[in-house]
Every structure is written in C-alpha cells, then in structure tokens.
C-alpha cells in the first residue's frame, strides 16, 4: 500500500491527472511517523488513515511538512532524507496548485 494525494469529484483534465505519491506505507511508518510523533503533528498524522483537505487547510499542512523536513535533517540517513524531501517538495508544490476550484477537496491517504 502507499499514501498519495488525489482530488475528489474530478471535474477537468488537471483534476483527472492530479495524483501525488507521498510514501509507501512501510516508508511512512519508518521515516515519517517518528517525526510526526516527536513533533506532535496533527494533519500529517492523519495521512496514514486518510484525511480530506480543503484549501484553508493547506498552510497548516505545509507548516507541518517543513517541521518534518527539519526533523529529518537531524534524524534520518541522507538516502532516506533525500527520498522524503523529494516527495515533500512535490506534495507542497501540488497542494498549492490543487485548488483551482474553491470547492475542491484533496484526499490524502
């Protein structure tokens, strides 16, 4: 299994093609979850079970992703950190683009 982001009720080509891979379930448990627990994060903690994200939620999620990156610098190997950073950057960039419709909902899980 893997964790990714998709848009619900896709209404155009952009939304049809919106798919952001975040992590395999095992990588999430091994590398993301320790950061989430150590930092007491709320939004990213819901990624493994699944969460609906609206446009107003994006700044909070991006802030948590920044905190995870800072934690990873001190706690992960370079290889794992690079892998995580690549996916976080892609997620951050795509979340900023996802809400071309005000009522769009992104599912992360």
Model-derived regions: residue spans:
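Acidic (Asp/Glu-rich) sequence patches and key acidic residues
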Residues: 1-109
């Amino acid at each position: 299994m893997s964790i990714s982001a998709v848009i619900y009720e896709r209404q155009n080509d952009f939304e049809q093609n919106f798919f952001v891979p975040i992590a395999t379930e095992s990588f999430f448990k091994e590398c993301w979850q320790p950061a989430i627990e150590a930092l007491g994060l709320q939004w990213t903690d819901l990624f493994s079970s699944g969460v609906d994200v609206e446009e107003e939620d994006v700044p909070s999620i991006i802030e948590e992703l920044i905190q995870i990156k800072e934690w990873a610098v001190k706690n992960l190997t370079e290889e794992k950190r690079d892998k995580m950073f690549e996916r976080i950057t892609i997620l951050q960039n795509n979340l900023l683009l996802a809400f071309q419709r005000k009522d769009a909902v992104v599912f992360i899980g």
